[in-house]
């Protein structure tokens, strides 16, 4: 089906998108029109994503991939349409409210580690939405035990990490946070192959933990 739409140059309709998901739909976007300022970039956009499903947005620069992520998280103006998590409408919630109430986390394309905080402290920042700090410490320890590169520098400031190690740290925070929806913009950009493998291993771990 994907090849058919690629050849014809047509976008799939909502009914066809639903066929690609299970009956357990977690994220729903219906007839979304969104953009920046007064400029509308997304037009009547639909999306359905099941629980524990991984979805990759592919397209040329300027196609609107980041705008879709920004709209889900709350960085754009929503002109019409709605976004739901498990049937709960979250269209007009702020990013902080989406993180707290329904567990939407966003890993930006640009580096977002805290350079003067230690590697371990950066990991623990991923658990600030949890009620029990003990659980956050336990999850952070699991990450450190699994990834030697982070474990060996757990007490050092994050600014000493290489670009690949910083990206690994950013995405590892999601293992501590345990979001219901994780948005990742360009997860492997600028990374060496060894780090790309680690990043996608983390994303697989998150998917299997659902």
Where are these regions (language model features)?
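Conserved ABC transporter NBD signature motif
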Residues: 81-90, 100-101, 135-140, 145
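The feature captures the beta-strand-to-loop junction immediately N-terminal to the Walker
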Residues: 58-60
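ABC ATPase C-loop
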Residues: 174-175
């Amino acid at each position: 089906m994907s090849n058919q739409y690629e050849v014809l140059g047509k976008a799939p309709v909502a009914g066809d998108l639903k066929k690609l998901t299970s009956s357990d739909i977690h994220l729903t976007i219906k007839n979304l029109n969104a953009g920046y300022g007064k400029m509308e970039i997304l037009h009547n956009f639909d999306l359905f994503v099941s629980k524990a499903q991984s979805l990759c947005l592919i397209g040329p620069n300027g196609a609107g991939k980041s705008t879709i992520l920004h709209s889900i998280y709350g960085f754009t103006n929503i002109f019409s349409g709605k976004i739901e998590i498990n049937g709960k409408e979250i269209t007009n919630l702020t990013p902080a409210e989406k993180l707290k109430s329904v567990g939407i986390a966003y890993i930006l394309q640009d580096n977002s580690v805290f350079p003067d905080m230690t590697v371990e402290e950066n990991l623990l920042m991923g658990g600030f939405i949890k009620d029990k700090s003990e659980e956050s410490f336990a999850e952070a320890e699991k990450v450190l035990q699994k990834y030697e590169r982070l474990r060996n520098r757990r007490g050092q400031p994050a600014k000493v990490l290489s670009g690949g190690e910083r990206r690994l740290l950013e995405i590892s925070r999601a293992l501590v946070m345990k979001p219901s929806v994780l948005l990742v913009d360009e997860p492997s950009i600028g990374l060496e192959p060894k780090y790309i493998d680690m990043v996608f291993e983390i994303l697989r771990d998150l998917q299997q933990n659902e």
